[in-house]
Amino acid sequence: MAKIKAKISESEALAKLAALGMDNKKGLDIVMLDLREIESAPTNFFVICSGNVPSHVSAICDGVFETIKKATGLNPNRIEGYENAEWILMDYFDIVVHIFLKDKRQHYRLEELWADGKEIKIETNSAKSNSKE
């Protein structure tokens, strides 16, 4: 039983690293969805954010990749959508990272589709800076 808890803990830590990578590249509206209680979920966590333009979306993807690689040595199993950078998906098995252009995020509404998951708001560096003013 302890082995399973460690695995879940590792996936949550990985999701938080992804969120940190997003925040480092000024990703917008960063959300973690905990899907562990959903039997049919394809992964333990979704980590979702938006970018302003395709180059911003690509930069966020690069930031997530670098942050996770530096901290854990892990590479994603697969990255989809990097070429057009409207919706990039990074599959790390235990977590899946979604980086959208704002309008694509509104169109696909992943947070609504997976509303049974527990939404975990991420406190970002930009939010901390704004609250100090």
Regions found by a protein language model. Name each.
Residues 1-38, 54-59, 72-74, 80-82, ...:
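Long, contiguous binding/interaction regions
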Residues 42-46:
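Short beta-strand segments
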Residues 48-50:
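Short hydrophobic/aromatic beta-strand micro-patches
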Residues 69:
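Post-Walker A helix-loop "phosphate-sensing" segment adjacent to the P-loop in P-loop NTPases
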Residues 60-65:
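Short amphipathic alpha-helices in soluble, non-transmembrane regions
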